Amino acid sequence: MNFLSIFVLIPLLMLAGLWAAQGIKAIRGVMVTGASALLIASVVLTFMYLGERSAGNTAEMLFRADTLWYAPLHISYSVGVDGISVAMLLLSAIIVFTGTFASWRLQPLTKEYFLWFTLLSMGVFGFFISIDLFTMFMFYEIALIPMYLLIGVWGSGRKEYAAMKLTLMLMGGSAFLLIGILGIYFGSGATTMNLLEIAQLHNIPFAQQCIWFPLTFLGFGVLGALFPFHTWSLDGHASAPTAVSMLHAGVLMKLGGYGCFRIAMYLMPEAANELSWIFLILTGISVVYGAFSACVQTDLKYINAYSSVSHCGLVLFAILMLNQTAATGAILQMLSHGLMTALFFALIGMIYGRTHTRDVRELAGLMKIMPFLSVCYVIAGLANLGLPGLSGFIAEMTIFVGSFQNNDVFHRTLTIIACSSIVITAVYILRLVGKILYGTCTNKHHLTLTDATWDERVAVICLIACVAGLGMAPFWISHMIGESVLPVVSQLIP
C-alpha cells in the first residue's frame, strides 16, 4: 500500500472504531489514537519528503501511486505530494489533533459529532494527497457535506440558517468547479484526469481557458472567502462548535487557495495571466474590507471571522501576483493563518464556555480571572497582527516583498492598499485585547470562573508552539514550499 493512502485509511478506521465504541472513554480513546496517528504520519511524511529531496529526487510529485478506478471516464485513484501538499497535510493533522482535545467535553451526541468530524477530516486529507481532478473533487465534496450537520446540530445561535447558507453557497461554488474541471479535461485532450498529464500537454485553447479559468477560480474562491462570496463564512464561523470552527477556518478554507493555485492557475496559465487583474481587485477588497469590518464587530467570533476573510484574501492576492516569492508567501500564509485562527477559535470557545457570552462589551478583566487563557489570547493576537518571531510576520512579509517585485503601477498600488491591512489589524487586535483582558470586571459571575483544564491546555500549547516555531524557524519549510511552487509559477510567467 502506498504510504499516502494512510491518510485516508486512518480516518476510515477511526469511523469504524467510533461506530463500535460504547461510552465516552472509548470514543475519546478512538479519537486521540486516530488523531495522534495522523499527526505522526504527517511528521514522518515530512521527514521522508525532505530526505528524498536531499537525496536529489527532483520529481515534481513524490510517493506517487495510480490505480485505475473507473475506466469509461478515465478516473484513477492517483496520489502524490510536493512541498505544498506536505505542508497542508501537516497543518491538517495539527488542527485535527488539537480540535479533538478542544471537543473533549462536548455534549450531547458525542459519538455522532466525532463521526462527522472524522469524515470531514478524511475529505481534507484525501483532497491534499490527490492529483486526479475527479478524485480531488470527490474528496472536496466529502469535506463539505459534514459541515451542514456539524453546524446545524451542534452549533449555536442561528445555526440552522448558518448551516443552510453555508451549504447552498459552497454547493453553488462546487457546481462552478465541476463545470470547470470537465471543461479542463475535455479541452486538454488528455487520456486521464491526472493534473500532471494535463499540465504537461499544455494544449487547452486560450479561448476555452478564458471560460474555464473564471469558473474554476470562482468555484474554489467561494471556499476561500473571496469577496463578495464570503458571507457564508461569517455566519458559519459564528454558529459552529469550537473544533469545527478550528477545522473550518484552519484547514477547510485553505482548500480554496490550494485549489486556485494547483488547478486553476497551473492548468490554465495563459488565462491566469490575462484575467488575474480582475481577481486581484476582488482579493484586494477582501483584504481591506475584512480588516475594516473586524474593527466594528462586538462578537468575538465575528471579529475573527472577518479577520479570516482578510487573511484568506491575502492568500489569493499573493498567488495572483504570479511570482515565486509571493506564491511562497501565500502558502506560508495558509499555514500561519490556519494555526492562528484555530488558536483564536479554540480560545474563544473556551471563554464562551465559561462566560456564556461572546459580546466584547460584556467582558473585562479576564487576565486576573483566567490568566492562562488570557496570556494565550495575547499571543494569538500578536501573531495575528504580525509580530516578528511569530508566524504571521514571516508570511505577510514574504507576500508583500513578492508583490512589490511587480514593477507596474497597478500591482504596486494594490500592494500598498493591501499593506494598509497591517495597521487596521493592529487597531482591532489591540483594542480587543485591552477591552476584554484588562479593566475592571463588573460581572460577579465572571469572578468565580476557572482557568483552562488540562485538555484545553494541550490544544492551546500545541498551537502556540507551532505558531512560534514557524515564526522563529521558517527557512526549512519556506525552502520546501519555494521549490514546489516553482513548476506552477514557471507556467505562469509569460
Name the predicted role of every residue range:
Residues M61-A87, L133-M136, Y140-Y148, L385, ...:
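Membrane-interface helix-loop-helix modules in multi-pass inner-membrane proteins
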Residues T33-L50, L170-I181, L373, Y377-L385, ...:
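Hydrophobic alpha-helical membrane-insertion segments
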